[in-house]
C-alpha cells in the first residue's frame, strides 16, 4: 500500500512544472524576536520524536574524513591564497557540522572573540543555534564580528530547529512543520519567485534543504550571507550578478585573478536535473519513509546515499535493479571526474603562465581579458565540482559547465601564449612539483607545520573553554 501511495505521488509530481520566476531582491532587514525562543538542543525533541531523533543521531556513523586535497593536489594551486588551499575534506554526517567547522584549518586558530581570519557567517549552516541567535539579536547582530565570537554560542550540531518550526502546534502533533529558519534564505526564495508560505509541499521539502545546500557569498561590511540569485540560479546568471557588483572572494596570488569560490550548490544544480524538473525532492531520495520496529512509518533522518535505502528510494520510481542503476551513476560520475581533471590541468597551467606574464612586465590592461577568462573558467569548474552529487542530480549540467570551463581556460591560455610571445618568452612555462598535497602547499608558500601546530593548540585549549561556557549558560546538555 505504501508503495502504491508513493507511486501515485510520483505520478502527480511528474506532471507539475518546475520553474523559476525572477523578482526584485528584498533588502536585508533585522528580524524582530518571536514570542517563543528557538530551542537548539536537539535531544529536547527525542521523547516526542524518537525515531526521527535516533536516525538523525545515526549520522554520527558517517564519520570518515576524506581529504580532497590529498586526492587531488591541483586544488591547492587553484585555491592558492584562500583557506581552502590549507584544508578541504569531503562532507560527512550532519552530526559533525559543528565539530568540522571548528577543526578545519580554514577557520584558523583564533585566541579570542576578535581574532581569526573568517566572519561569523561561517557558522550559518552548522547549527540551530544560528536560528536562535538571529531570533535573539536580529541578522545584523548575529552577523557582526569574527567567527570566534560565536564559539561559546553555536554548540549544537545541525538538527531539528534548522528545518522544523519546533515551537508550533503542528510539530507538537507530529507533523513536519517545515520552515525556513534563515531569513536570508527566505528572501532568496522570494527573489526567484518561490515564497515559502505559498510553495507546494514538494517545493518546501527541497527549499528547507536549500537553506544550506546552495551557492552564497558574504555581503557588505557585516559579511552577511546572501544568495546571488538576482539574475537567476544558473552558472551564467550568478556570474553575471557577481561581475556586475565586481565581487570576488579572494585574489589568487599566482595569476592575480580576482576569484569566485563556489560553495555547495546542490539546490541550483538539482533544480535543472531530471529529478528536480519532475518534483523528485531531496527528501524522496535522501530521507525516505521507513518502518520502525512496530511497523509505523517515519521519515529517516539519517541523510545519506539513496542506494543504501534502494527499496524505499530509487525503486519507488525506477524499474531497473540496484546494480544496473549503480552502473549508470558510476559511468556518469567517471565522465564528470575525467573532464574535471582535464579542466584543472588547464587552469593550473593558466595560473602559472599568468604569473610568468606579470613577471615579464605585462600591464593590467594586457592582463584584464586573460584574468576574466581564468575567473570565468574556474567559476564554472568550481560550481560543477563543489556540488558533490552533481553526477546524480544533474550530470548533463555538470558536463555543460565543465565544457564551458574548458573553453574559457583554453581562451585564457591562447591569449597568454600570444602575450608571452610579445615579451620574448616562447618556451613552455614549467610547473613546480605538485604531485602531492604537501608539495603543492609548499609551492604556494604555506607553512603547514606552523598552521597545523596552531590549530592543534586551538582545539586543545579554546574549544573546551567554549563548551564549558555553553554548559554554564544552559546551551548544551550537561
Curated annotation (Swiss-Prot):
Binding site for heme c 3: 94, 209, 212-213
Pfam families: Cytochrom_C552 (PF02335)
Family according to the record: Belongs to the cytochrome c-552 family.
The reaction(s) this protein catalyses: 6 Fe(III)-[cytochrome c] + NH4(+) + 2 H2O = 6 Fe(II)-[cytochrome c] + nitrite + 8 H(+)
Pathway note: Nitrogen metabolism; nitrate reduction (assimilation)
EC number: 1.7.2.2
Species of provenance: Citrobacter koseri (strain ATCC BAA-895 / CDC 4225-83 / SGSC4696)
Subcellular locations according to the entry: Periplasm
Coiled-coil regions listed in the entry: none
Positions bound to heme c 2: 160, 163-164, 301
GO annotation (BP), single: anaerobic electron transport chain
Cofactor(s) of this protein: Ca(2+); heme c
Protein's UniProt name: Cytochrome c-552
Note accompanying the cofactor annotation: Binds 1 Ca(2+) ion per monomer.
Signal peptide per UniProt: 1-26
Binding site for heme c 5: 275, 314, 317-318
Entry keyword Transport: yes
Amino acid at each position: 500500500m505504501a508503495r502504491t501511495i508513493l507511486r501515485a505521488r510520483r505520478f502527480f509530481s511528474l506532471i507539475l512544472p518546475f520553474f523559476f520566476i525572477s523578482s526584485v531582491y528584498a533588502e536585508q532587514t533585522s528580524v524582530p524576536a518571536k514570542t517563543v525562543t528557538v530551542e537548539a538542543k536537539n535531544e529536547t525533541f527525542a521523547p516526542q520524536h524518537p525515531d526521527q531523533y535516533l536516525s538523525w543521531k545515526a549520522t554520527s556513523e558517517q564519520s570518515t574524513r576524506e581529504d580532497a586535497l590529498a586526492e587531488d593536489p591541483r586544488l591547492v594551486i587553484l585555491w592558492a591564497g584562500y583557506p581552502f588551499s590549507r584544508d578541504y575534506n569531503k562532507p560527512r554526517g550532519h552530526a559533525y557540522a559543528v565539530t568540522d567547522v571548528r577543526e578545519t584549518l580554514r577557520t584558523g586558530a583564533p585566541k579570542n572573540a576578535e581574532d581569526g581570519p573568517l566572519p561569523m557567517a561561517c557558522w550559518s549552516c552548522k547549527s540551530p543555534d544560528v536560528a536562535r541567535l538571529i531570533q535573539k539579536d536580529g541578522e545584523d547582530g548575529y552577523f557582526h564580528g569574527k567567527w570566534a565570537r560565536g564559539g561559546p554560542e553555536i554548540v549544537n550540531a545541525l538538527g531539528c530547529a534548522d528545518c522544523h518550526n519546533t515551537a508550533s502546534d503542528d510539530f507538537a502533533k507530529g507533523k513536519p512543520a517545515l520552515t525556513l529558519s534563515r531569513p536570508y534564505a527566505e528572501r532568496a526564495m522570494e527573489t526567484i519567485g518561490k515564497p515559502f508560505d505559498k510553495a507546494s509541499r514538494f517545493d518546501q521539502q527541497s527549499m528547507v534543504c536549500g537553506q544550506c545546500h546552495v551557492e552564497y557569498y558574504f555581503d557588505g561590511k557585516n559579511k552577511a550571507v546572501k544568495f546571488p540569485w538576482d539574475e537567476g540560479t544558473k552558472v551564467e546568471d550568478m556570474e553575471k550578478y557577481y561581475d556586475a557588483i565586481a565581487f570576488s572572494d579572494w585574489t589568487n596570488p599566482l595569476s592575480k585573478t580576482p576569484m569566485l569560490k563556489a560553495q555547495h550548490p546542490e539546490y541550483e544544480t538539482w533544480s535543472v536535473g531530471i529529478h528536480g524538473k519532475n518534483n523528485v525532492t531531496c527528501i524522496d531520495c535522501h530521507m525516505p519513509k521507513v518502518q520502525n520496529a512496530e511497523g509505523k512509518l517515519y521519515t529517516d533522518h539519517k541523510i545519506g546515499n539513496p542506494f543504501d535505502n534502494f527499496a524505499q528510494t530509487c525503486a519507488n520510481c525506477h524499474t531497473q535493479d540496484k546494480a544496473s542503476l549503480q552502473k549508470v551513476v558510476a559511468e556518469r560520475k567517471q565522465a564528470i571526474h575525467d573532464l574535471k581533471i582535464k579542466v584543472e590541468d588547464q587552469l593550473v597551467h593558466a595560473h602559472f603562465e599568468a604569473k610568468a606574464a606579470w613577471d615579464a612586465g605585462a600591464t593590467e590592461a594586457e592582463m584584464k581579458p586573460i584574468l576574466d577568462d581564468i575567473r570565468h573558467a574556474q567559476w564554472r569548474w568550481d560550481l560543477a565540482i563543489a556540488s558533490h552529487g552533481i553526477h546524480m542530480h544533474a550530470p548533463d549540467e555538470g558536463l555543460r559547465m565543465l565544457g564551458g570551463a574548458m573553453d574559457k581556460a583554453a581562451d585564457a591560455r591562447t591569449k597568454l601564449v600570444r602575450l608571452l610571445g610579445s615579451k620574448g618568452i616562447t618556451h613552455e612555462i614549467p610547473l613546480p612539483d605538485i604531485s602531492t598535497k604537501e608539495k603543492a602547499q609548499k609551492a604556494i608558500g604555506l607553512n603547514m607545520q606552523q598552521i597545523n601546530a596552531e590549530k592543534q593548540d586551538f582545539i586543545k585549549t579554546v574549544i573546551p573553554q567554549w563548551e564549558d561556557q555553553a554548559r554554564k549558560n544552559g546551551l548544551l546538555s550537561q
